[in-house]
């Protein structure tokens, strides 16, 4: 197929109606950015062929370190405060993204014998970077593992008062996710976990989610979590209103700090 990137989409005609099929599914308009792509020279790694893969949603897997659990009222997220769930048999809420069961990377480490006994070859980790949700697809800091699933070595009091939705008052959350000691300790734990997985002959796939983030992200800092913390630049929210920078299209202004 040559050395060039191949882009394609399907154009479907039925009478006077024309529609298109691309990465967004079926639509009535064509956009170049949603075309399918084939990368030349791509080959499936040999170790992946026939491998047994085990996907881990970290918060719901195993609580190996209760000291890093998200607390009820630690911060405000999508209309309400965070909730710590003690009963693992509880049915998740409809809006369960702010409910935390306490699973963490230490819990994954503790269960490696179990995973190996199952015959697992590859561990696929759902997102693990700093994020206010339990699924962590709305990344807050791509440089660091979330201390709530990593290690918290520096902590403080400071839960939100009842009725308070201002996360600049969420002192406990701010300390946990901005203190470099917590972030570095969490990165170190992740490194130790990956090294141990590799030592056992298994592989790791990380769901990086590098194509989108959330408004908690330090680049924007809508929640004013980073604005007064040492070592962080002012987020974009500090410099202009939220208009169009959540979706970056060709020709839009760069999201540079």
How would you name each of these model-derived features?
Residues 58-121, 128-257:
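Substrate-binding/active-site clefts of carbohydrate-active enzymes
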Residues 1-55, 63-80, 87:
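The feature marks proteins involved in alpha-glucan
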